[in-house]
From Swiss-Prot:
Superkingdom to which the source organism belongs: Bacteria
A GO biological-process term: cellular response to cell envelope stress
Conditions for induction: In exponential phase (at protein level).
The encoding gene: yqcG
UniProt-recorded name of the protein: Uncharacterized protein YqcG
Length: 46
């Protein structure tokens, strides 16, 4: 694998991770604000 392909794969994983965090925020938004805050903080850091 070239370096460019590795970087593209890594960016794809980061995008997928962001989607998971967004989904988590939506799921836990109603009753678990602490989990939501943690997910948002991690989302911002990525």
């Amino acid at each position: 694998m070239s370096e460019e392909n590795k970087e593209n794969g890594f960016n794809h994983v980061k995008t997928f991770t962001k989607i998971i965090f967004i989904f988590s925020v939506l799921v836990f938004n109603d009753n678990e604000y602490k989990i939501t805050d943690a997910a948002v903080n991690l989302f911002i850091q990525i």
